[in-house]
Amino acid sequence: MDKLGCKKKIIILARRIKWRINQCRYHLRFVNKKCMVAPGSSISRDLVAGAYSWIGPGSIIYPRVQIGKLALLANNVTIVGGDHNYRHAGVPMVFSGRDELKPTIIGDDVWIGAQSIIMTGVSIGNGAIVAAGSVVTKDVKPYSIVGGVPARFIKMRFNEYEIEQHEQMLKQPDSYFKQFEYLLLSGKDRS
């Protein structure tokens, strides 16, 4: 076996060991074994996440969140909600309870920049990019780039032809992406 082949095998083994540690740490039953969760995150046990997704250190993820495959959540991304019920006159908010959490859907191949806040109940379409430090309060269309407080449309990531090509790639089975797996940890480890 050549040096590169050996290095790839070591990298893949390191990923598997990290996954087992994360699985024990966060009790993640619905997260694909090829999804990586960095240490220092607060993750709801009902998180659903696809293969090759990355959740950066210091992230906070409330219940009822679904993350697609190949998604990147940078450091300190927060997905929050559960607003206090403030509509009961004569009752302090601390005793008024909370509204029911709405599901939050993050599509495939989405990149959410560092320090961004995503409010629960939002849907972020496939291939979208959320700029660092943004606050997302409304749905984000597929392949759009948004940023700001609150997040607003900046531009499209791809043209129509490129979107069609990219969608075809995203339809590939997880086994297709195995050829790129060693790139996830090669060079500098992200955690």
Predicted feature locations:
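Flexible, glycine/small-residue-enriched loop-and-beta-strand segment within the central core
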Residues: 21, 41-49, 54-122, 149, ...
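Extracellular beta-strand-rich, repetitive "passenger/adhesive" scaffolds
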Residues: 34-37, 55
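Conserved sequence/active-site signature of Rossmann-fold short-chain dehydrogenase/reductase
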Residues: 78-79, 135, 145
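Beta-rich strand-turn-strand
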Residues: 114-129, 134-138
